[in-house]
Swiss-Prot record:
Nucleus recorded as keyword: no
Matches recorded under InterPro entries: Ig-like_dom, Ig-like_dom_sf, Ig-like_fold, Ig_sub, PDGFRL
UniProt keyword Disulfide bond, yes or no: yes
Source species, domain of life: Eukaryota
Subcellular location(s) of the protein: Secreted
Record keywords: Disulfide bond, Glycoprotein, Immunoglobulin domain, Repeat, Secreted, Signal
Residue spans of biased composition, Basic residues class: 40-50
Name recorded for this polypeptide: Platelet-derived growth factor receptor-like protein
Ranges where the Ig-like C2-type domain occurs: 47-159, 272-375
């Protein structure tokens, strides 16, 4: 009996040990709070570098890529460089990719509606063709695609192209000027340009004063030379005024440009500075009266006048005259005086009241008024 009791206890003990062994592996201690549960390893892991898609770099390149192509002959096209030299007489053909392309080219071609220039638009590209080119055609040619939403269009800055083209012509180192003498106004608040542009990028160009005769250095501080614009006065002042000309040298030949009169402007930029004055503010019946509106401004800024007067609603006949002239006010300072005068003959009671003058330029407008009474 004791034997069977001992045997049963022994079997029960072994069964309990087997169950405990399944839940508590040997040599494993309980983890403390905060202990890292990731098994340490001596292997060095290589950091993973995220792959950059090639498409991204391709897209950024495409965005800045010019849409302009130049015809090279035999059906070949290539993207033009920033500057291109052609011989006068050659045909220029440019194409810009896009279904709605706009163009910009030297104003000389647009001013005279030159028949040598044609611009066409096809389904996939715009085309500009210039035949029988001359030195006067030298300048910037650019294009851009239009983005339109209904009737509202804007320039797509990601799809543009431009090139500056020199048309070299024998005996013409300078881009021809329509006159033999030109005026350049020196404004203290903006750059001034003496437009000595050349037809060959290799030409050496210098600036000269007529009297006293001397070369004016383009030192990069006050004056710089830009072959696409000419001599640029960065900060014009009264000492720069006078008559100047340019001299170009290339291929053992030299040429003198037209002369330029540099005039210093003393009137600051802004809306018109306007005054109004009546010949008399009290007028008897049957007399004549005039009201003068005067503007002092920059020499190269045009002014437009508009009048409101008492007899206007009754269609009272009046005479209006607009004039302008340049005046020199000491130390070479130059001002443009623009005037408008309204003349009323045989003054009547309907002519009494306010005479209102509005003067307008590109920078704004000014309105002034005066009263005229019947006496």
């Amino acid at each position: 009996m004791k034997f069977w009791l001992l045997l049963g206890l022994l079997l029960l003990h072994e069964a309990l040990e087997d169950v405990a062994g399944q839940h508590s592996p040997k040599n494993k201690r309980p983890k403390e709070q905060g202990e890292n549960r990731i098994k340490p390893t001596n292997k060095k892991a290589k950091p993973k570098i995220p792959k950059v898609k090639d498409r991204d770099s391709t897209d950024s390149t495409a965005k800045s890529q010019s849409i302009m192509m130049q015809a090279m002959g035999n059906g070949r096209f290539q993207r033009p460089a920033a500057t291109v030299s052609l011989l006068a007489g050659q045909t220029l053909e440019l194409r810009c990719k896009g279904s709605k392309v706009e163009w910009s080219y030297p104003a000389y071609l647009d001013t005279f509606k030159d028949s040598r220039l044609t611009v066409k638009q096809s389904e996939r590209y715009g085309q500009l063709t210039l035949v029988n080119s001359t030195a006067a055609d030298t300048g910037e040619f650019s294009c851009w695609e239009q983005l339109c939403n209904g009737y509202i269009c804007r320039r797509d800055e990601a799809k543009t192209g431009s090139t500056y083209i020199f048309f070299t012509e024998k005996g013409e180192l300078f881009v021809p000027s329509p006159s033999y003498f030109d005026v350049v106004y020196l404004n203290p608040d903006r750059q001034a340009v003496v437009p000595c542009r050349v037809t060959a990028p290799s030409a050496k160009v210098t600036l000269h004063r007529e009297f006293p005769a001397k070369e004016i250095p383009a030192n990069g501080t006050d004056i710089v030379y830009d072959m696409k614009r000419g001599f640029v006065y960065l900060q014009p002042h009264s000492d720069h005024q006078g008559v100047v000309y340019c001299k170009a040298e290339a291929g053992g030949k030299s040429q003198i440009s037209v002369k330029y009169q540099l005039l210093y402007v003393e009137v600051p930029s802004g809306p018109p500075s306007t005054t109004i004055l009546a010949s008399s503010n009290k007028v008897r019946g049957g007399d004549d009266i005039s009201v003068l509106c005067t503007v002092l401004g920059e020499p190269d800024v045009e002014v437009e006048f508009r009048w409101l007067f008492p007899g206007q609603k009754d269609e009272r006949p009046v005479t209006i005259q607009d004039t302008w002239r340049l005046i020199h006010r000491g130390l070479g300072h130059t001002t443009r005086i623009s005037q408008s005068v309204i003349i009323v003959e045989d003054f009547e009671t309907i002519d009494a009241g306010y005479y209102i003058c509005t003067a307008q330029n590109l920078r704004g407008q000014t309105t002034v008024a005066t009263t005229v009474e019947f006496s």
